[in-house]
């Protein structure tokens, strides 16, 4: 399953891309994130690998993260894996009239067939992008 989503962020591209990989601030906008573990290289650099550990309702859920390519402030390609699912996110940060256009090409692969409509995935991705947008623009409490 593949799709593309985009959002305009009212900040310059350098700030947006810097905050996107700032591990100290990531828990402020990445819902449920409680720990980031480096396994290979410096996480969020090309060929790095690690874990992002989330906590939902007291249950910890580790998610593997690897970086296929990091060419910030322009682009970062990340692969996220949880049991049964593989997700590739190719994020482009484009300078756009003193703002940033964030375009994300998303791909999912699943071990088993599922009946979740594509629209749900698009909606979830847009929601998480808008949370990051609000964080960058200083609108999160």
Task: List PLM regions with ranges.
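Generic structural detector for well-ordered beta-strands
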Residues: 6-10, 37, 53, 66, ...
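Intrinsic-disorder/low-complexity, polar/charged segments enriched in Ser/Thr/Lys/Arg/Asp/Glu/Gln
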Residues: 2-6, 49-51, 62, 75, ...
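Beta-strand elements of well-folded, non-transmembrane domains
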Residues: 11, 56-58, 69, 95, ...
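Glycine-rich portal/gate segments that line the openings of hydrophobic small-molecule binding cavities
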Residues: 38-84, 127, 131-140
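Beta-strand/loop substructures that line and gate deep hydrophobic ligand-binding cavities in soluble
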Residues: 79-134
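Hydrophobic ligand-binding cavity/cleft-lining segments
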Residues: 1-45
